[in-house]
């Protein structure tokens, strides 16, 4: 079977924004965008940028039945993404991330060409899905640290939105096996790598290798009881760009190296969950679920969490969920 889909999107951004004159000149906007200045207040400029983005998306796929519960799928997708307001206009302290973020009025739309291949096996007891993909993105938009800036509120790292030509490739694995009517085991694993082909550097903020295993026990005769234990293993990201920079410390009149690039160590988490039904009447029941995440109270930091520089992730936590059905 062959499937084809096409979509067109039009985005228009009309905005008014104040820039500090010093920042405007520092970013080189006085040469490229002098025509959008509508008022000059000396230390500040009021500008009125307007951008139009035309986007076309196309997807086509070919599936083939191999017989004996097996099939393969090949897919090609073309997509465009217009930059959002943050990527264009960010210009100051991002309070929730404790960093200064700078957008760029020159940012263009992204164009992605993605090809993928998927193998499926689906039987009464087992399900296996393996997918590999390759994605070439022209004008890939990303956010990267470039230095430090001192303000009256303190010193903050500066992150800037940039664009490069990039490739992303990886694989996903999903497996489920029913041992018997009561026990099921599952595995989900994912791998991904990103490369800046413009300068042959690794991309920032790429997920590391992750594998999750789960064992579930179910007995419908015991008030629809189920219990499961989940193991989540996340490896350390070993492919990352070096964006470290030096910062001046006035108290010691010296420079120190700020290691903003090194990813945190690998970590392993155990999670457990159990649920069952409490019957109230013939038509009413309450589904009770109890779970413990991070059972071993592991100290870890997630590489993609923008607050990982300041604190660990949440430790052991308990939750109870009640669902009333009627």
Each language-model region and where it sits:
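Transmembrane beta-barrel domains of outer membrane proteins
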Residues: 1, 61-65, 108, 118-122, ...
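Conserved C-terminal beta-signal and adjacent last beta-strands/turns
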Residues: 63, 71, 77, 113, ...
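Surface-exposed extracellular loop regions of Gram-negative outer-membrane beta-barrel proteins
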Residues: 1-47, 53-59, 63, 178-193
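Outer-membrane beta-barrel signature, preferentially recognizing the C-terminal barrel domain
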Residues: 34-57, 61, 65, 71, ...
């Amino acid at each position: 079977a062959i499937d084809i889909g096409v979509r067109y999107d039009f985005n228009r951004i009309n905005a008014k924004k104040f820039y500090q004159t010093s920042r405007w000149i520092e970013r080189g906007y006085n040469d490229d965008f002098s025509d959008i200045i509508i008022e000059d207040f000396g230390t500040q400029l009021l500008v009125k940028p307007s951008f139009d983005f035309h986007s076309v998306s196309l997807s086509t796929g070919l599936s083939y039945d191999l017989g004996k519960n097996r099939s393969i799928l090949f897919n090609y997708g073309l997509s465009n993404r217009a930059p959002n307001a943050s990527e264009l206009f960010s210009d100051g302290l991002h309070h929730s991330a404790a960093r200064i973020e700078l957008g760029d009025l020159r940012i263009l739309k992204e164009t992605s060409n993605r090809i993928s291949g998927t193998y499926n096996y689906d039987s009464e007891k087992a399900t296996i899905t393996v997918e590999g993909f390759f994605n070439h993105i022209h004008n890939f938009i990303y956010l990267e640290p470039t230095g430090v800036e001192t303000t009256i509120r303190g010193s903050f790292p500066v992150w800037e939105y940039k664009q490069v030509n990039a490739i992303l490739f990886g694989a996903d694995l999903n497996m489920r096996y029913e041992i018997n009517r009561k026990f099921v085991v599952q595995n989900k694993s994912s791998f991904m790598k990103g490369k800046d082909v413009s300068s042959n550097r690794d991309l920032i903020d790429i997920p590391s290798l992750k594998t999750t295993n789960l064992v579930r026990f179910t007995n419908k005769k015991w008030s629809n009881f189920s219990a499961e234990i989940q193991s989540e293993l996340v490896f350390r990201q070993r492919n990352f760009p070096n964006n470290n920079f030096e910062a001046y410390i006035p108290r010691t009149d010296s420079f120190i190296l700020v290691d903003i690039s090194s990813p945190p160590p690998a970590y392993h988490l155990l999670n457990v969950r159990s649920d069952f039904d409490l019957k109230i009447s013939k038509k009413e029941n309450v589904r009770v679920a109890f779970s413990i995440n991070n059972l071993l109270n592991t100290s870890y930091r997630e590489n993609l969490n923008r607050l990982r520089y300041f604190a660990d992730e949440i430790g052991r936590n308990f939750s109870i969920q009640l669902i009333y059905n009627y």
